[in-house]
Amino acid sequence: MSYLLASALLFALGVYGVLTRRTAILVFLSIELMLNAANLSLVGFARAYGLDGQVAALMVIAVAAAEVAVGLGLIVAIFRHRESTAVDDLSELRG
């Protein structure tokens, strides 16, 4: 059960990071922390109850790797266009 406690703590830290950080890269890292917390809980449940949580965790890791590539590409493109990665600046729409 310590896996679930660690997973809940990591997820809470990720939520805190998403809600308080203002740069896109730190928000992105916080989201990745939340995904890793979900992976940890999947593996913890699989260890405790004999389920196939490892397979689901590997799928989440594969999807997260693709998400990292696309997300960092978007952040770099936004930085080149606006010279800032502040989330508050991204909320302004241009027509």
Curated annotation (Swiss-Prot):
Catalyzed reactions: a quinone + NADH + 5 H(+)(in) = a quinol + NAD(+) + 4 H(+)(out)
Enzyme Commission code: 7.1.1.-
InterPro entries for this protein: NADH_UbQ_OxRdtase_chain4L/K (IPR001133), NUOK/Mnh_C1-like (IPR039428)
Lipid bilayer topology: Multi-pass membrane protein
Keywords, in A-Z order: Cell inner membrane, Cell membrane, Membrane, NAD, Quinone, Translocase, Transmembrane, Transmembrane helix, Transport
The organism's place on the tree of life at top rank: Bacteria
Principal subcellular localization: membrane
One GO CC annotation: plasma membrane
Subunit structure, interactors included: NDH-1 is composed of 15 different subunits. Subunits NuoA, H, J, K, L, M, N constitute the membrane sector of the complex.
PANTHER family given in the database record: NADH DEHYDROGENASE SUBUNIT 4L-RELATED, NADH-UBIQUINONE OXIDOREDUCTASE SUBUNIT ND4L
Family per similarity comment: Belongs to the complex I subunit 4L family.
Protein name: NADH-quinone oxidoreductase subunit K
Source organism (scientific name): Thermus thermophilus (strain ATCC BAA-163 / DSM 7039 / HB27)
UniProt gene name: nuoK
